[in-house]
Amino acid sequence: MTSGSPARAALIALDWGTSSLRAYRLDGAGRTLDTRHLPWGIMRLPQPLQDGAATASTQSGFELAFEQACGDWLRAEPALPVIACGMVGSAQGWQEAAYLDVPVDLPRIGTLLTRIDRAGATPVHIVPGLIQRHGLPNVMRGEETQVFGVLFDQAGGGADDVLIGLPGTHSKWVTARRGRVTHFDTFMTGEVYAALRGHTILGRTMSEAP
């Protein structure tokens, strides 16, 4: 899916997860000018052809997916910075971006991006995920950018402590204080429900969502 605007952009942002790739062309105020949604998650990448046959080069697969997502944007505006978040920075991704330990000040994330150099082409910078080592070990990749957005919107609102709910297959509840992530928990409710619905006798009694 794509939508478009000829307005001048300031940034390309990628939300690159396990099952899909979302690309956003943003202006200087953070407004969305263009969006694209492709089925190329890190576990399902396009395969380059070599002598008419598909090859198994993972790096080439990432390059192909990246080109489909925003190659024309960069040809039109080659100086645009590109920032990516999500599982693209995992050990199975394009390049691993080290986790930052919680508690952490969110502005610090922007100073520790992992750079992917692309043979003279526009580099890609990957946002680090967060890891919580105390208590039950916990990690996140991609959700930290959503937390950043919530806290940015809350700036000046007078609330010191914020509890943020992030629904999904692996839902998260994040506690933040004055721009600092102090704790988060992950719940596998969505995945457990999907497993029950698809692989147990209980699933036969579950109706479709309205």
Model-flagged regions — what are they?
Residues 43-45, 131-158, 162-163, 167-210:
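Glycine-rich phosphate-binding loop plus the immediately following alpha-helix
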Residues 52-77:
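Conserved active-site "lid/cap" helical segment
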Residues 27-31, 120, 175-180:
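Short acidic-glycine loop/turn motifs at beta-strand connectors
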Residues 17-22, 38, 87-91, 166-172:
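Gly/Ser/Thr-rich loops at beta-strand to alpha-helix junctions
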Residues 2-6, 75, 117-119, 153-158, ...:
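Solvent-exposed alpha-helices and their adjacent loops that cap or buttress functional pockets
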Residues 11-60:
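Short glycine-rich, Thr/Ser-proximal phosphate-binding strand/loop in the N-terminal lobe
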Residues 71-137:
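Short beta-strand-loop/turn "lid" adjacent to the catalytic site in phosphate-handling enzymes
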Residues 11-15, 81-83, 162-166:
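Short glycine-aspartate micro-motif
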